[in-house]
Amino acid sequence: MNQTVKVKKKKKTITLGVVHIRASFNNTIVTFTDIQGNTISSASAGGNGFKGARKATPYAAQVTVDRASEKAKEYGLKTISIRIGGPGAQRESAMRALFGQNFVVTSILDVSSIAHNGVRPPKRRRV
């Protein structure tokens, strides 16, 4: 009689990590990584059931941060550094949601890319 034994994989404990928040005009993406950049958990507003213009709301960003941080806390993450980028209006509410998750925040860094007269903008919208 052959029996298979399931071996439960041991989760790594990571105490220090980086939170990458990308707040675009259309969506919010939150990624928790370790110091080397390996992804621990990630979530997006679209993946949390928000569709269309509701993905770009501050409430959607708050829910996204809550979902991603729940997964990251399973790894024992306690101390984070925040890297926030993008032009979206959800930046502030995403950071407030992170402060409410009882993480120790060591630094906040704005990594938004600033165009120095780079590419041509899209044509004006006609309604």
UniProtKB/Swiss-Prot annotation:
- Record-linked Pfam families: Ribosomal_S11
Tell me which UniProt keywords the record has, alphabetically.
Ribonucleoprotein, Ribosomal protein, RNA-binding, rRNA-binding
Q: Which GO terms describe its cellular component?
A: ribonucleoprotein complex; ribosome
Any single GO BP term: translation
What's one GO MF term for it? rRNA binding
What the entry lists under InterPro entries is as follows: Ribosomal_uS11 (IPR001971), Ribosomal_uS11_bac-type (IPR019981), Ribosomal_uS11_CS (IPR018102), Ribosomal_uS11_sf (IPR036967)
Provide the function of this protein: Located on the platform of the 30S subunit, it bridges several disparate RNA helices of the 16S rRNA. Forms part of the Shine-Dalgarno cleft in the 70S ribosome.
Q: Which HAMAP family match?
A: Ribosomal_uS11
Q: Would you identify the family this protein belongs to, as annotated?
A: Belongs to the universal ribosomal protein uS11 family.
Q: Return the PANTHER family for the record.
A: 40S RIBOSOMAL PROTEIN S14/30S RIBOSOMAL PROTEIN S11 (PTHR11759)
Can you state the subunit structure given in the record?
A: Part of the 30S ribosomal subunit. Interacts with proteins S7 and S18. Binds to IF-3.
Q: What is this protein called?
A: Small ribosomal subunit protein uS11
The organism encoding this protein is: Rickettsia rickettsii (strain Sheila Smith)
